[in-house]
Structures are given as C-alpha cells and as structure tokens.
C-alpha cells in the first residue's frame, strides 16, 4: 500500500542515533486529512485527495494516485502509517534565488583574473556566431533561478513522534522553513 502525507517543513537540526553518530535531519510537521476519494467505477482511476490547512484561509490539496480505497472523506492521515527506516520521496517548491548570473546559475568558470583583464570576470562571453543572426534557443544565460518544483528521492525516515505528528527525514528537503511538502513512499 502506498504511504503519503502532506507536511510543513519546520527546519533542520542534528540528532544522534544509537551508535552516537550525528545525523542532520529535517523536521516535518504532518497533519492532513482526506478531502476526496476517487474510485475506478466513477472516475476511471483510484486516488485519494489529501488537504492540509497552512493558515485559516489557505488550504493545500494534493491527489495521490493508487491509494487505498478503504479511506473515507474526513479520515486523518498521520505519521503512524510510516515506519522508521522507510525510504520516501519528498516534493516541494525549491528556494527561489532571484535573478542570477551565469556563474551561479549554470556554473560557468568565468575569465582569468590576470593577463590584462580588468572587468568582465563573470561575463558569459559570446552568445552566438555572426551567421544565424539570432540567439539559438536554449542558450544558457543569466536569469531567474530556483522557485521551481523539486523532488528529493530515497530520503530515509529516522524518527517519528506520533503524539506531536512530527517526522524527521535524514538530510535536506526542498523548500524554505514553513513550506508545504509532499511525502510519499518510493514505488
């Protein structure tokens, strides 16, 4: 059975395991409920829509396909469906970095800082030849960076607190603190 939940990223911290090794983890608060159930007969596919209230006026909804048909509208989806050691995928909106140059955005090397160079150390260089007389599509240039949907795969669940509905995931997950993320098991 597929496991899935919506959660709010609280931030990162360090915890210690039984072998006294330090683990960098991301804490996620998970409190969501089923808002719609789709079935094969009526809709042509089976899925469960889960919602989570971030503020009083803002509700996030996400549909997870291939979910259990035993769920009903209003059922709570908590962290108790996950187990320590589970591998999950985490999706969310990555951090936006604004307008960035080619060195940060695409990893260009830049020009040498010696041999007569005074300016343009981080310039992109030529953007095309004389003949086509236009810039070719897909040319890597400066522009807006980040702020797109990102999925981190095979992240390990290292701690579950059922009373507080908290989950600790090993490593970093997409988004800023307070962002809504989707957590689901690896197929």
Where are these regions (language model features)?
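Extended basic (Lys/Arg/His-rich) segments that typically form rRNA-contacting surfaces
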Residues: 1-187
């Amino acid at each position: 059975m597929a496991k899935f939940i919506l959660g709010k990223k609280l931030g990162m911290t360090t915890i210690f395991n039984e072998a006294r090794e330090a683990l960098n983890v991301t804490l996620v608060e998970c409190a969501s409920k089923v808002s719609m159930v789709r079935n094969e007969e009526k809709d042509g596919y089976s899925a469960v829509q889960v919602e989570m209230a971030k503020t009083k006026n803002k509700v996030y909804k996400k549909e997870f396909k291939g979910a259990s048909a035993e769920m009903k509208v209003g059922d709570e989806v908590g962290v108790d469906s996950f187990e320590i050691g589970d591998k999950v995928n985490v999706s969310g909106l990555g951090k936006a970095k604004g307008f960035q140059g080619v060195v940060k955005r695409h990893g260009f090397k830049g020009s040498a800082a010696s041999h007569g160079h005074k300016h343009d150390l981080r310039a992109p260089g030529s953007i095309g030849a004389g003949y086509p007389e236009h810039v070719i599509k897909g040319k890597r240039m400066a522009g807006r960076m980040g702020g797109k949907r990102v999925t981190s795969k095979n992240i390990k669940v290292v701690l579950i607190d059922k009373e507080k509905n908290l989950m600790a995931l090993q490593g970093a997950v997409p988004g800023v603190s307070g962002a809504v993320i989707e957590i689901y098991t690896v197929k």
